[in-house]
């Protein structure tokens, strides 16, 4: 009788462990990679944009140090560039060519890697193009001193 109870108890524990094993992998499968989270942020940027063309990821800065919790907001920094695809086409931006002399924006903010929540807090600012002539003028132009130190004996 005692062995039947022990066997029944062991069977229940085995069932619980099996169920737990099925649940844990599905939870970890819902975490996005850093790049996937940024690509979703770019998609959200395109959805909310009022500009004529889609933007596509141009450059992604290094991901932050590993953090085990996918629900913790991660800092991101990336650059997007305007493509030739009009926004209403709803074509994936990855399939669009970059527009020659298209706008470039630097984006910073935070993303969460949890697929369910997928929170994004991103701000993008257009980068100013600098002509080489302007840059050379700034470098060669003599700088006026802002202050002078005079030593008196």
Swiss-Prot record:
It comes from the Eukaryota. Gene3D superfamilies: 3.10.450.10. Residues 30-130 form a propeptide. One of its GO terms (cellular component) is extracellular space. One of its GO terms (biological process) is defense response to Gram-negative bacterium. GO terms for molecular function: lipopolysaccharide binding. It holds the Pfam family Cathelicidins. Belongs to the cathelicidin family. This is Antibacterial peptide PMAP-23.
């Amino acid at each position: 009788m005692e062995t039947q109870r022990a066997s029944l108890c062991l069977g229940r524990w085995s069932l619980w462990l099996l169920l737990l094993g099925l649940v844990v992998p599905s939870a970890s499968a819902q975490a996005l990679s850093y790049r996937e989270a940024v690509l979703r942020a770019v998609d959200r940027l395109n959805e909310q944009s009022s500009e004529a063309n889609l933007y596509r990821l141009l450059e992604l800065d290094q991901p932050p140090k590993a953090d085990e919790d996918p629900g913790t907001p991660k800092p991101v920094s990336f650059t997007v560039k305007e493509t030739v695809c009009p926004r209403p086409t709803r074509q994936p931006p990855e399939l669009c060519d970059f527009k020659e002399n298209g706008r470039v924006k630097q984006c910073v903010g935070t993303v969460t890697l949890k697929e369910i929540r997928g929170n994004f807090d991103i701000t993008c600012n257009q980068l100013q193009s600098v002509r080489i002539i302007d840059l050379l003028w700034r470098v060669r132009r003599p700088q006026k001193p802002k202050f002078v130190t005079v030593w008196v004996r």
